[in-house]
Amino acid sequence: MDFLIVLKALMMGLVEGFTEFLPISSTGHLIVFGNLIDFHSNHKVFEITIQLGAVLAVVFEYRQRFSNVLHGVGKDRKANRFVLNLAIAFIPAAVMGLLFGKQIKEYLFNPLSVAVMLVLGGFFILWVEKRQSRAEPKIVDVDALRPIDALMIGVAQVFALVPGTSRSGSTIMGGMLWGIERKTATEFSFFLAVPMMVAATAYDVLKHYRFFTLHDVGLILIGFVAAFVSGLVAVKALLRFVSKKNYIPFAYYRIVFGIAIIILWLSGWISWE
C-alpha cells in the first residue's frame, strides 16, 4: 500500500473525527480537504464509513448510558422514551435521504455548495445564539425531551443532507431554536448520530460492497481508527466547552472558512468538479 495514500487516508480520518460533532460540517471539510490533498477513493463509501468511527467514539464515551438504555427497554419508562425520541428524530432525514440522496450527491457535493452553506449556517448560529441569550431554555435535560421536541430536531436534521450545513449544527441549533438548553441539545445530537450514521453506513456498504478491494478495506480501517480517536477527543472537548461557552466562535469560523473556500477556488487551488 502506497505510503502517501495511507497518509492521506489517515489525515481524512482525523479531519472527520475532529469535525463530526462540531457545528462546522464534517462532510464539507472532507470534500474540501479531499480536494486539496487530491484524495479520491475508488468507491463512494470511504467518507460515510469513517464517519462510523467517529460515531463509535460517542458510543464509547456514553457506554454506561447506552448500556442502561439497552437493559431498560421494555421495562423502564425513561429508557423507552429515550429510544422513542431517537426513532422519531431519525425518521425525517432518513426518509428524505432515501428519496433525494442520489440527487443531493450528484448536484450539491462540491466546494461551492459547501462554501455557501458554511457562510449561511454561520449567520444562522449567530442568530440562534442571540435568541437563546434573551430567553430561558424550557428543557435542560435529555430525559425531559418530549416526542414533539425530538420531531423538531429530526426536521432540522433534514437540512444537514446538504453538505456544508452540518448534521450536528442543524440538530443542535434546531434544538436550541425550539427552546432546548445548549448542552442538552448537544448531547441529544451526539446520541442521534449513532442510529443516523449506522444506517447511512449500512446502506452505502450494501449498495457498493461489490466494488470493495483489499486496498479499499485497508484505507477504510486506517481512516476509521483515526476518526474514532480524534472523535473521542472532540466529544470530550466539546462537552466541556458548551458547559461554559456558546457556539459563536464556531459561527465565525464557518463564515471565514466559507469565504476561504471561495478564495481558494478563485486562486485555482480547488475546483468545483
UniProtKB/Swiss-Prot annotation:
It catalyses: di-trans,octa-cis-undecaprenyl diphosphate + H2O = di-trans,octa-cis-undecaprenyl phosphate + phosphate + H(+). Pfam families: BacA (PF02673). It is a multi-pass membrane protein. GO terms for molecular function: undecaprenyl-diphosphatase activity. It is an enzyme of class 3 (hydrolase). One of its GO terms (cellular component) is plasma membrane. Belongs to the UppP family. HAMAP family: Undec_diphosphatase. NCBIfam families: PRK00281.1-2 (NF001389), PRK00281.1-4 (NF001390), undec_PP_bacA (TIGR00753). Bacitracin is thought to be involved in the inhibition of peptidoglycan synthesis by sequestering undecaprenyl diphosphate, thereby reducing the pool of lipid carrier available. Catalyzes the dephosphorylation of undecaprenyl diphosphate (UPP). Confers resistance to bacitracin. This is Undecaprenyl-diphosphatase. It comes from Neisseria meningitidis serogroup C / serotype 2a (strain ATCC 700532 / DSM 15464 / FAM18).
